[in-house]
Amino acid sequence: MTQASDCSSEKTLSEAIKGRRATLSFLPDPVPENDLKKILDAGLSAPSAYNLQPWRFVVVREVEQRARLRRAAMNQLKVEEAPVVVVACADLEGWRSGDLDEIIRLAQQHGYGDEARHASMRKNIANFFSAPGNAGGLAPDFAVWANRQTMIAMTTMMWMAEVLGYDTAPMEGFYEDQVKATLGILAHVRVVALLAIGHRKGEDKRFAGRFAMQRTVFAEKWGNPIP
């Protein structure tokens, strides 16, 4: 795979946000390894409550595997066309099976807090996610919380891809059981979304307009439009 990056097409974040459209069809041109790593690293740098990072990502690039994934994704052509499809997942058991230990180790490595704080982190995280009602009552269940966290990370990847000059298509249309079977995803892991990355073939969707801020953003109380 070529290592060259088409830096001439890089955008500012503002340009990426304003100009992004869901890409309907992709060229087969590969995404260079160094650009892909930048995209993935951006997602791994996303905010995460308690630094738990419940997200997991399966990067699908092989032609045959993309074709199989397409069948599990409601036969969407872009899944097979895009040179890279990132399958965003949420690990519902990671914090119980090693992630919490790694969080503490990383905190120690980076000089974050002392032993008392690390002990408190371990206790508080375990208590929070073991509490009746799950997630301390802040979410209907742990899967909902992990899904939210994973979407933040995947969206961050999407913006980095757009900044680097690539086109993207986030997708929620798939059969989770089929995606899991195709990719060998474990039972305690949820498939959250798919993100196709590449260069568009033809035109993107035309801009269809967005609600005015006064319709969707309120000041201080619900229903009070922001000035």
Locate each region found by the language model.
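Acidic, surface-exposed loops and disordered segments
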Residues: 1-227
